[in-house]
Curated annotation (Swiss-Prot):
Protein name: Blasticidin-S deaminase
Binding-site residues for Zn(2+), renumbered to this chain: 59, 100, 103
Domain of life: Bacteria
A Pfam family per the record: dCMP_cyt_deam_1
Family membership: Belongs to the cytidine and deoxycytidylate deaminase family.
Gene this protein is translated from: bsr
Length: 140
């Protein structure tokens, strides 16, 4: 997988996502936070919305992208998601998580040249959405 150097702005993006989920965490409601940075440097953050029926749950990345697009933002640079442990988990670490398949599709649709921060082998890694969803289906 092709990777890129982690910048101070990337670390700040992780911190914004971490602060968002730390502030809004609720068992069985919100345990993932996300932050997306636009190419102008603006950061939009969100938490996921969990539902009793799993397929109704909306991921934090989708909410962050939707919020940004709803406010006229279109040019995205980097996105990250972090997971807060449930209250009964022994390990209390908030960790960067890789986007699910649906979020990879959504990121690719709205930001095909976006960077994505993920954790790989315990290390923060910066890659492109194209690396995470190669040979993406397109209508063309």
């Amino acid at each position: 997988m092709k990777t890129f150097n982690i910048s101070q702005q990337d670390l700040e993006l992780v911190e914004v996502a971490t602060e968002k989920i730390t502030m809004l965490y609720e068992d069985n409601k919100h345990h993932v936070g996300a932050a997306i940075r636009t190419k102008t440097g603006e950061i939009i953050s969100a938490v996921h919305i969990e539902a009793y029926i799993g397929r109704v749950t909306v991921c934090a990345e989708a909410i962050a992208i939707g919020s940004a697009v709803s406010n006229g933002q279109k040019d995205f640079d980097t996105i990250v998601a972090v997971r807060h442990p449930y209250s009964d988990e022994v390990d209390r670490s908030i960790r960067v998580v890789s986007p699910c398949g649906m979020c990879r599709e959504l990121i690719s649709d709205y930001a095909p040249d976006c960077f994505v921060l993920i954790e790989m082998n315990g290390k923060l890694v910066k890659t492109t959405i194209e690396e995470l969803i190669p040979l993406k289906y397109t209508r063309n």
